Amino acid sequence: MSPPAEIQADTLKRFIAGWGGWTMESFFATLSDDFTQKPLPLSCGEPARGREQLYPLLSSLMTMMTNFKLTIHNTIHDPSNKAAVVYAVADGDTPFGPYHNEQAVFIWFNSKGDKVDRIEELFDTAFMAEFKPKFKKWALENPGAAAGRPPPANTST
């Protein structure tokens, strides 16, 4: 049986607010302990990441990017499948130019509906083909930006 739609809807709202808040704490607040993130399309060849692998990547990205703005264009919530989809555009400033990434994020909730268990993110491949090499170079030159470990998932909401 699926958790109540209201619980999932609240978790979705908190996930989007955390993403838009653009801090490590706000982003990780709704993620379960066994959370995974899979970059799409599959042709990009990026592996799925758990909390431990995602943390340094996001830490670097959040350290490097300023003036982050998330614009949500569409949200679809399917409570019976414990899932949602968000179409958004993320904008910001980086040391090597503007960041403008269209994304479709597929979200799955845990059995209680109070945490996000998995996301699959479909990125703008044209933008990412240009951005990723610049970001990887910056991350190698700024290794301290990826410091730390993710906080444990808090099971209370």
UniProtKB/Swiss-Prot annotation:
Entry keyword annotation includes Oxidoreductase: yes
Disulphide connectivity of cysteines: none
InterPro entries: Fungal_Meroterpenoid_Isomerase, NTF2-like_dom_sf
GO molecular function: monooxygenase activity
Alphabetical UniProt keywords: Monooxygenase, Oxidoreductase
Pathway terms, separated by semicolons: Secondary metabolite biosynthesis
The protein's Enzyme Commission number: 1.-.-.-
Record's keyword annotation contains Ribonucleoprotein: no
Protein origin, superkingdom: Eukaryota
Family note: Belongs to the avfA family.
Cited function: Monooxygenase; part of the ergochrome gene cluster responsible for the typical purple-black color of the ergot sclerotia. The ergochrome gene cluster produces several ergot pigments including the yellow ergochrome secalonic acid and its derivatives, as well as the red anthraquinones endocrocin and clavorubin. The pathway begins with the synthesis of atrochrysone thioester by the polyketide synthase (PKS) CPUR_05437. The atrochrysone carboxyl ACP thioesterase CPUR_05436 then breaks the thioester bond and releases the atrochrysone carboxylic acid from CPUR_05437.
Name of this chain's protein: Monooxygenase CPUR_05417
Organism name: Claviceps purpurea (strain 20.1) (Ergot fungus)
High-level lineage: Eukaryota, Fungi, Dikarya, Ascomycota, Pezizomycotina
